[in-house]
Amino acid sequence: MLENYRNLVFLGIAAFKPDLIIFLEQGKEPWNMKRHEMVEEPPVICSHFSQEFWPEQGIEDSFQKMILRRYDKCGHENLHLKISCTNVDECNVHKEGYNKLNQSLTTTQSKVFQCGKYANVFHKCSNSNRHKIRHTGEKGLKCKEYVRSFCMLSHLSQHERIYTRENSYKCEENGKAFNWSSTLTYYKSIHTGEKPYKCEECGKAFSKFSILTKHKVIHTGEKPYKCEECGKAFNRSSILTKHKIIHTGEKPYKCEECGKGFSSVSTLNTHKAIHAEEKPYKCEECGKASNSSSKLMEHKRIHTGEKPYKCEECGKAFSWSSSLTEHKRIHAGEKPYKCEECGKAFNRSSILTKHKIIHTGEKPYKCEGCGKAFSKVSTLNTHKAIHAEEKPYKCEECGKASNSSSKLMEHKRIHTGEKPYKCEECGKAFSWSSSLTEHKRIHAGEKPYKCEECGKAFTWSSSFTKHKRIHAAEKPYKCEECGKGFSTFSILTKHKIIHTGEKRYKCEECGKAFSWSSILTEHKIIHTGEKPYKCEECGKAFSRSSSLTRHKRIHTGEKPYKCEECGKAFKSSSTVSYHKKIHTGENP
């Protein structure tokens, strides 16, 4: 019986209880039961010595005898006595015996040691345990210190190290100890610079398998993390978490100094340097100092002209990654920044901030010289130059001076005729970005400037400003020649031509000359017969925009021109002028 028992153990077939009792009764060294007392299944055989598996039912004696004969050739009788060994170094007897047995067994015979549920052949006891637990879902191993259960002994051992602080894995380089061998292996790679995990796609190596896994997503293009708010997908959960802040507006990172909140820890760290006033990173080219090395590197690209961030869609390159990210939204049509007031969306947070000022009417930028306030810092800077009377930027073409280089560049387009800003909707091009922005409102039907007096809305701020003067009867622009006042400077300029008699705008078709370019444009329509201005209400067309504007008042009933004498209102300025003669006694 004992001999049979030894043979079964050697083959990796766990003994049943009666055999175990007989073995103990014969006075042999007992098994180390401590390791197995929590497991309901038969005890574990050394993973380095044999393949631990329950025996298949109905194995013929002849086959078992054949294996036993091969066992006899290995020539080691006491292999079964070291059943509870956990380390291959402790188990040299097993290791030697296992190698001989492995050479003796054929592939067919090895298949005896299989999982009873699926025909998977395992090479280690630990693997077979994991495999069987997947079928049962059993968690039989309990921690004595904490009320926690584990499927496998290895998991329990790892858990126990946390509270016992058993740092059994020591670094030979500096003596630092770790709970797990995997942590030690990773730590060692810091000293050696070893990167054992290589990407098969591009050859790039990494120190951690988890980093390699993350890297592989670049090649597969897989984006498993999806935003429920806008549907945008990402290849990392951390990027999705950062993205979500756009929708929530959350700023969880707060400055202890001033209480200001930020959406990312990196932005907070950059901000903190403002309080510390530390700027240790200096540009050798221009002397500009920065509070971070990364900011200095970005700044240097201004001097070098380097543009490392390229758009795969159109090939356009950028100096900064943030600029590329913003640019990509043009192709994607993505506009994550939404105005809560009117619902309009933008692809940049800075544009949304500027847009909000339309609704609030806020003018946070004040001139120290005269107290005048502005909605933009750029407009304030331009204004300041009026007080300083500094105009260092001169046009070589016409001699006109400007207080900013950007204004001079814009002015030069008058001479060159350059129109770099094109409308994607209709193809119309403009010399200035502001003109394109205003033009786009025509397609969108947007009229953000609303008159509080009469409720009329306007597409452009300039039109709104002019309109307000109708209610205020304000005419700040006065003619020095005749004293007549006007609501806009452009109308005053046109008026002055009456006194000079100048007619510099000539029609090429008939030779007729005009004082104003707008009148020439309207005159040309006589020759073409074109009527581009159409009433949406009744379909009637006009050759002049002013005629269409006057016509629309028939439908709206609007009477913006008021008589100051009697309060009567009229649809056109000419009608109110005619009416005023009744009060003055002039012949109408």
UniProtKB/Swiss-Prot annotation:
One of its GO terms (biological process) is regulation of DNA-templated transcription. It is found in: Nucleus. InterPro entries: KRAB, Znf_C2H2-type, Znf_C2H2_sf, Znf_C2H2_type. Residues 1-43 form the KRAB domain. GO terms for cellular component: nucleus. SUPFAM superfamilies: beta-beta-alpha zinc fingers. Keywords: DNA-binding, Metal-binding, Nucleus, Repeat, Transcription, Transcription regulation, Zinc, Zinc-finger. The keyword Transmembrane helix does not apply. GO terms for molecular function: DNA-binding transcription factor activity, RNA polymerase II-specific; RNA polymerase II cis-regulatory region sequence-specific DNA binding; zinc ion binding. Belongs to the krueppel C2H2-type zinc-finger protein family. May be involved in transcriptional regulation. This is Zinc finger protein 676. It comes from Homo sapiens (Human). The gene is ZNF676.
